[in-house]
Amino acid sequence: MAKQDYYEILGVSKTAEEREIRKAYKRLAMKYHPDRNQGDKEAEAKFKEIKEAYEVLTDSQKRAAYDQYGHAAFEQGGMGGGGFGGGADFSDIFGDVFGDIFGGGRGRQRAARGADLRYNMELTLEEAVRGVTKEIRIPTLEECDVCHGSGAKPGTQPQTCPTCHGSGQVQMRQGFFAVQQTCPHCQGRGTLIKDPCNKCHGHGRVERSKTLSVKIPAGVDTGDRIRLAGEGEAGEHGAPAGDLYVQVQVKQHPIFEREGNNLYCEVPINFAMAALGGEIEVPTLDGRVKLKVPGETQTGKLFRMRGKGVKSVRGGAQGDLLCRVVVETPVGLNERQKQLLQELQESFGGPTGEHNSPRSKSFFDGVKKFFDDLTR
């Protein structure tokens, strides 16, 4: 039986941040935990699925592999043979929520994961439709290459905090209650840096700009977001790096407008072509193509050219190009042209176009009836 999608198991979107994933996990883990559903095999199986999904989606490397290859990334021993097994104690799930209140915390605070970054990328319509690889340069915090993220001077090590003795927490008595709090001396890390690194001054990270090559898939549109796992800021003291999100913005095109997978454009034609019909050239993203215009074409008519639109990045059929005809009124007429048009108008039966312009005749008949009704 096919395995369920990890994001669906936790009820989060594919772009969910780590804190959203942790929140969803805690809610579901409390509901299906074996200690609360003793003897319920379905709840036990559901809990294992939840824990497996959580362990993948909170590990940046595993999540990146899963996003690219799905469950196949962990088949044939890819997870080291049962890397998700085992139960979980309630204190593991909820200790960091209730620890400060009841003194049952999980001890030393983990080093903070690096912050996620966002980069706004403008693309031309052609680049968005066909795909492109672009180089970007971003300011970020990277792991210090001297101390390798420890913050300590090479040859030295962080020292155990003398206040909390390495636990990251201290106990404060308030009347009959003992409350555990984050150690104010080491900020919960359990260690102190006595001899800080000269380059990063004990932070373990340095400010730097880096250049990345970003592959934009064909078919993206404004609002789409591309995730580059591990390309955000470096984590504190060796913690995992954050992610980089590239936000796509497609620039306005001088000819085409995009709606979903379809492209739209306006094609001007003269009134003679509209009346008599003929063949014109229209632009597409792949070059010019011929379009046959039938006689008696009215302005605003849409002509659909199938398969000349956009193929969505999410798959599916290629969109179409819809050409909207605009019949232009001639300008800059010479005397001969004016005379011919005057003769043509007379042949139509006057301005109302009784013989050849049914819409005009219908309109003027309606106007006449309106005023006749007013004078009765």
Swiss-Prot record:
Cofactor(s), names only, from the UniProt record: Zn(2+)
Subunit structure: Homodimer.
Domain of life: Bacteria
Protein name: Chaperone protein DnaJ
Zn-finger segments (CR-type): 131-209
Organism of this sequence: Escherichia coli (strain K12)
Lineage of origin: Bacteria, Pseudomonadati, Pseudomonadota, Gammaproteobacteria, Enterobacterales
GO molecular function: ATP binding; heat shock protein binding; protein disulfide isomerase activity; protein homodimerization activity; protein-disulfide reductase activity; protein-folding chaperone binding; sigma factor antagonist activity; unfolded protein binding
Cofactor note text: Binds 2 Zn(2+) ions per monomer.
CXXCXGXG motif repeats: 144-151, 161-168, 183-190, 197-204
Effect of residue 35 to N: Loss of ability to bind DnaK
Pfam families for this protein: DnaJ, DnaJ_C, DnaJ_CXXCXGXG
Effect on the protein upon substituting residue 33 to Q: Loss of ability to stimulate DnaK ATPase activity
Induction summary: By heat shock under the control of the HtpR regulatory protein.
Family classification: Belongs to the DnaJ family.
Cellular-component GO terms for this entry: cytoplasm; cytosol; membrane; protein-containing complex
